[in-house]
């Protein structure tokens, strides 16, 4: 009697474990067919961040901070990467730009929208700073010239003439840069719809018949 109970219990346990072993065998066979490779994870979704403007040089930290707002610096094992600088500009953003000229390449940066007056003023101010730096460098190079104390009056006269020419050309270049900056700011203000004035309506003067 005891043997019969033991046999029935073993058969009952074997019947319950058969489906589980079948499922486990199917999973092992699928893993064997794939060669034991793990499924490749999908690439992470990259965030795109709109830029206010594009700097002519990424070494200009002030321009980078102004143009690329809320930059997150991601520390990777290889190098430190500025997040958001490499996103390409859309075609619709390029359509808002003014037609570029050869002189625009000297700007500190290029705004993404012509309606952003603060951005235009910031980018155009870089030309004035660059002109002042050129003027100061030329004047310092002139001061570092040869010593004319032992060469006579002719050398001193030549240095004076050269210094006046350098100063005159530098001041003229600075004046042209400032006038161009003002012209571009006026152009950007004309493109701003808020600053455009409404067309003036003609006012007709009506005379009172009592004064005729």
UniProtKB/Swiss-Prot annotation:
Task: Give the GO molecular function terms.
Answer: cytokine activity; endothelin A receptor binding; endothelin B receptor binding; hormone activity
Composition bias, Basic and acidic residues: 168-181, 189-205
Q: Which UniProt keywords apply?
A: Cleavage on pair of basic residues, Disease variant, Disulfide bond, Secreted, Signal, Vasoactive, Vasoconstrictor
* Disulphide-bonded residues: 53-67, 55-63
* Tissue-by-tissue expression: Expressed in lung, placental stem villi vessels and in cultured placental vascular smooth muscle cells.
User: One of this protein's Pfam families, by short name?
Assistant: Endothelin
Q: Where does the signal sequence lie? A: 1-17
Positions of region (Endothelin-like): 109-123
Q: Which residues form the propeptide?
A: 18-50, 74-212
Q: Where is this region: Disordered?
A: 168-212
Q: Which GO terms describe its biological process?
A: adenylate cyclase-inhibiting G protein-coupled receptor signaling pathway; artery smooth muscle contraction; axon extension; axonogenesis involved in innervation; body fluid secretion; branching involved in blood vessel morphogenesis; calcium ion transmembrane transport; calcium-mediated signaling
Q: Name one GO cellular component term.
A: extracellular region
Q: Where is this site: Cleavage?
A: 73-74
Localization annotation: Secreted
What disorder is listed for this protein?
Question mark ears, isolated: An auricular abnormality characterized by a cleft between the lobule and the lower part of the helix, sometimes accompanied by a prominent or deficient upper part of the helix, shallow skin dimple on the posterior surface of the ear, or transposition of the ear lobe/antitragus.
Q: Give a short account of what the protein does.
A: Endothelins are endothelium-derived vasoconstrictor peptides. Probable ligand for G-protein coupled receptors EDNRA and EDNRB which activates PTK2B, BCAR1, BCAR3 and, GTPases RAP1 and RHOA cascade in glomerular mesangial cells. Also binds the DEAR/FBXW7-AS1 receptor. Promotes mesenteric arterial wall remodeling via activation of ROCK signaling and subsequent colocalization of NFATC3 with F-actin filaments. NFATC3 then translocates to the nucleus where it subsequently promotes the transcription of the smooth muscle hypertrophy and differentiation marker ACTA2.
Family according to the record: Belongs to the endothelin/sarafotoxin family.
Record-given protein name: Endothelin-1
Species source reads Homo sapiens (Human)
| Gene it is expressed from | EDN1
